[in-house]
Amino acid sequence: MKNYIVSLSKRALLLSGALAIFTACDDGDLGDIYKGNSSGEYVSDVNWTDAADKSTGTYIKYFYENASGRDTFCGSIYWEKPNTPETGEPASTGGSGGWSQGHALDIVIDAYIRHANNPEYQAHLYENIMKPFLPAFDDWNEHCGYGGKDFWNNFYDDMEWMALSCLRVYELTGDQDYYSALMKMWNHIKGAKNDYKGVGGMAWKTDAPASRMSCSNGPGCLLAMKLYQLTVKEAKDGWEEQAAYYLNFAKEVYNWMTAYLCDISTGQVYDNLSIKDDGTPGDPDKIGRAHV
């Protein structure tokens, strides 16, 4: 097996691949990819599939590159810059950031979906990235400093992002290892809905029960909804009761979040709040976030 490492740049993730598109192309390519008329009604001649593929190719090159001494992927984030294989410098194995590992996998999943008519390329992504990623992520998570066994992580949102990605892989490939990982994470995640002082919502961290953040409530609600849909679709023994549980979980979190961490008149999503000692929600930090 080849040696790989995941080394994710915070900027690259926050810009959702925009910078990666530019680094994927030399100056001669940019004019061919980005065309359009900015006056009047915007019409674009961009081939977005081509642009996405170029971005994904660059992403895989820089963030899933070989790392000496590693026999699997290693989820390890280097916050300030990506690896630069062409320089001959070794890939970074330092840093930590579990929240971005699910996003790393999502980029590969999106490429897998785009190429539904190219089974050879899909097989390449599945065999060379998806399959080795999961056990390596499990190993990294256990030793990252704030994780543990069975995909447990002190940050609920880290587990939620990864669980959402695992669910996507399972739905696309039927990989039972990903389903098992998904359910292990869900068993941890559901504890975030701790009803601390009877207030509701989902905590941000396991050791901060009064914490309430959009990044834990938004994806937590979404995960419960997707588990509801999956349970209904598969209709396994006893599915009705389990589906009802997921649906009720999602509704309760949604109702709480829209009441306390959103301005539904504008669509603004607040960052966080804390539950006060008297059991009332504190004032939210109204810095806008895009977690839902």
What are these regions (language model features)?
Residues 2-13:
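Bacterial N-terminal signal peptides that target proteins for export
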Residues 21-24:
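C-terminal motif of bacterial Sec signal peptides marking the signal peptidase cleavage site
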Residues 26-149, 176-199, 264:
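Low-complexity, Ser/Thr/Pro/Gly-enriched N-terminal "stalk/linker" regions
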Residues 40-43, 102-121, 161-175, 219-239:
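Well-ordered alpha-helical scaffold segments within catalytic/enzyme domains
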Residues 176-256:
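Aromatic- and glycine-enriched pocket-lining scaffold segments that form the walls
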Residues 239-242, 246-285:
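Catalytic cores of carbohydrate-active enzymes
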Residues 287-292:
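Conserved small/polar residues in nucleotide/adenosyl-binding loops
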